[in-house]
Amino acid sequence: KPSDELLNLWNHQVEMSEVLTSRADAISASEPHRAVMLVMADRLDATVRRNADTMYRSADDFLADLRIVQRSLADAGAPRAAYGPVQTLIWQVETFGFHMVEMEFRQHSLVHTRALADLREHGRHGDLAPMTREVLDTFRAIGSIQKRYGEKMAHRYIISFTKSAQHVADVYELAQLAFAHPEDVPALDVIPLFEQLEDL
């Protein structure tokens, strides 16, 4: 017997897309867990195709659905399914999300300093140096990657030859300047590298 939690998930799926749920119900009318998983599989396909109507917004949303299925299977007396293939899939999503590797970005602190000086002199829409434009484009690329694949795919930003906390602040300021709207600024985990003893 499916749990109330699983039935609520199914009802949510019906509200989201009657097309997906009617197809799953036709295949697995007497198997509610399988029907829910079929819709989840269709939503994963929609995520790959960037179908905004039914796609998963994040790997965490997919993980939450998986855990509902797992708990319901366990409560229904199917621990082998709950803690076998479903658990394996949960581990994979926890490890990789919707991607296989995490990207890291790295730039010298002096490049940031020069880019900020250039921006202060010419403004964001002025005649900027190629290196400044490249720095801004990097933050825009990070934002695009996060929107498409999730924050965990690209959030680490390494500053080489960091000498002070100001160099960390520079990164956040540049990230803000790269976007016209604050909500588009990507989340960043800035990692300063102090590569000279006197800077430690």
Locate each region found by the language model.
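Core mixed alpha/beta domains of very large multi-subunit molecular machines
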Residues: H112-A117, E121-I191, Q196, L200
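Extended, charge-enriched "interface" segments that sit outside catalytic cores
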Residues: P2-R148
